[in-house]
From Swiss-Prot:
The last Arg residue of the ACP-binding site is essential for the weak association between ACP/AcpP and FabH. It comes from the Bacteria. This is Beta-ketoacyl-[acyl-carrier-protein] synthase III. The keyword Transferase applies. The keyword Secreted does not apply. The gene is fabH. It is found in: Cytoplasm. It comes from Ehrlichia canis (strain Jake).
């Protein structure tokens, strides 16, 4: 049976770093309050001339190098983003051009913070169907450009960055993506959204969020989704080496671990260094886990994310 094997992982964070203390110069907050409430210590912010496609391309190049494959071996590029360079064309086609992947077709998907898990599921199905062999899956966001920097309830939470994974068809029965599950509930679309849109008012707008309710949904739905994928594969918490949750808030990660009785040392946490990077969150956390020596070959990991829509999903993978 064909499996989608992770060949390489790459990441990119802009050079500019904004600490919590720097935010206190423009809004009423404190480093202590932000760290206690979110676990965030700093965030990376893109330069004015830096585009989402630039960051995505940088992360992709590192992933390709890590995988040890040539750019022309890529059959498909999927970019998960809420902040593309332009309304159209897709960010993925711009990345394809910048990379020079002449043999690939490319498109974007938008599921906000769940975007990377959605993209992994789509890529996995393309590979399993035999339509493609090797896929570049990228999550990239410039969230700083859709923030109200005077709204302390949202501007302290987000950062910019990109992460990428190279997936390739494999017949190794014990490695690769084992299964995914995806969910949506549009009745909650007004809990997390932007104040603008192409058809709505012709401007990008800024992030608006009912933080308390989103927080509650995140704990409930991430927990249920993790239990669902474990049940589907006849696995228990003890069978999983690592849990890589969307890096939105340290308290969400802690409370999901507590609710499911997951030993906290199994939780991958990188939010302190880059804040909530939306669709880039999962691959950035994976890159951190790999580069820090935690994530090793043959480890079993659960990737889980939730975002606006609401959308949420989980991916079970053996590295």
């Amino acid at each position: 049976m064909k499996r989608s094997l992770i060949l390489g992982i790459g990441s990119y964070l802009p050079k500019k770093v904004v600490t919590n203390d720097e935010l206190t110069l423009t809004i009423e907050t404190s480093d202590e309050w932000i760290v206690k409430r979110t676990g965030i210590k700093q965030r990376h912010i893109a330069e004015d001339n830096e585009m989402t496609s630039d960051m995505a391309t940088s992360a992709a190049k590192l992933a390709l190098d890590n995988a040890g494959i040539d750019k022309n071996e890529i059959d498909l590029i999927i970019v998960a983003t809420t902040t593309p360079d332009r309304t159209f064309p897709s960010c993925a086609t711009i990345v394809q051009s910048k990379l020079g992947c002449k043999n690939a077709f490319a498109f974007d998907i938008q599921a906000v913070c769940s975007g990377f898990v959605y993209a992994l599921s789509i890529a996995d199905n393309f590979i399993k169907s035999g339509q493609v062999r090797t896929v570049l899956v990228i999550g990239a966001e410039i969230m700083s450009r859709i923030l109200d920097w005077q709204d302390r309830s949202t501007c302290v939470l987000f950062g910019d960055g990109a992460g990428a994974i190279v997936l390739s068809s494999s017949t190794e029965d014990d490695s690769g993506i084992i299964s995914t599950n995806l969910h949506s509930d549009g009745t909650f679309h007004d809990l997390l959204y932007t104040s603008g849109g192409t058809a709505y008012n012709g401007v990008a707008g800024t992030i608006c969020m009912n933080g308390t309710v989103v927080f509650e949904h995140a704990i409930e739905k991430l927990s249920a989704s993790i239990l669902e994928i474990l049940s589907q594969n006849d696995l228990e918490i003890c069978d999983i080496d690592w849990f890589v949750l969307h890096q939105a808030n340290i308290r969400i990660i802690e409370l999901v671990a507590r609710r499911l009785k997951i030993p906290y040392e199994k939780m991958i946490v990188s939010i302190d260094q880059h804040a909530n990077t939306s669709a880039a969150s999962i691959p950035l956390a994976l890159y951190y886990a790999r580069s820090s020596g935690k994530l090793k070959k043959h480890d079993v990991a659960v990737l889980a994310a939730i975002g606006g829509g609401l959308t949420w999903g989980t991916c079970l993978v053996r590295i």
